[in-house]
Amino acid sequence: MTKTIFITGTSSGLGKLTALHFAKRGWNVAATMRTPETENDLTAYDNIKIFKLDVRDIQQVQAATERAIADFGKIDVVVNNAGAGSYGPLEFAEESTIDWQFALNVRGPINVIRAFLPHFRAHKGGMFINISSFMGVLTAMPTGSLYNMSKFALEGLTEGLYYELKPLNIELRLIEQGGSKGNNFLNNVVFNTHSEIKDYDDLMGKVNAVFSAAKEHSLDDPQTIVDEIHALATGGSQKFRTLVGRMGNDLMALRNAVPIEEYLAKIASNFA
């Protein structure tokens, strides 16, 4: 029987590449995005159906879930990919930005997971693959506290759910990625700024330089991330956590090699 994968955030970047990857390999794909009326690439495939979805909107999540199940009959794998990041001093962040960061990166996956649990229970199994970041297991850059918070929360959510859902044959997996090439990297970042407070200017200048450099190098080939998603979905990998990319693996090696105080001092010194 043909398997079906449900993916959030497929309008561009990693989400779109994942949808195309699975469609080309014979899977049915429920591809979701906030603006399906603007999509052209995915509509060329008969085994891809597009559903309107903003993961922050519980009613839209429920509607997209019900429609996907009605159209395909059974969903085997759900990929929580939709997400973005807020950077800048916490002092500058608007209340709306704080709420947005948590709503998109944490409440969004919660909404999708809760919507699919009755379906997975009815079919006595299923898999959630949550797209996290190495920034969900360690800190690597100043001014990323809100993004770190959201990804640390996603990691904790996924690990905590493992114990609830394992007895029901519902699997949970984490992909911990860095930025990827061709993923409109900076389009997925919101910067917190303040025109009057200058105390953070030097630090922000160094952080912005890192972001600018990331556009040219240090980003991973997104296909390596898609390949890991495919391995998890097909049983080729049984890992609970999959850390993808050179930067994340290098930082994790450093984090595991030294006490936390030494690690934090090392990262801070890179921006001194």
Regions found by a protein language model. Give the residues of each.
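Active-site helix of classical SDR
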Residues: I113, S150
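Substrate-binding pocket helix/loop in short-chain dehydrogenase/reductase
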Residues: P89-L90, T97-W100
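Conserved glycine-rich cofactor-binding loop
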Residues: S11-S12
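Residue(s) in the substrate-gating loop at a strand-loop-helix junction
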Residues: S133
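The beta1-alpha1 cofactor-binding region of Rossmann-like NAD(H)/NADP(H)-dependent oxidoreductases
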Residues: L53-A63, E95
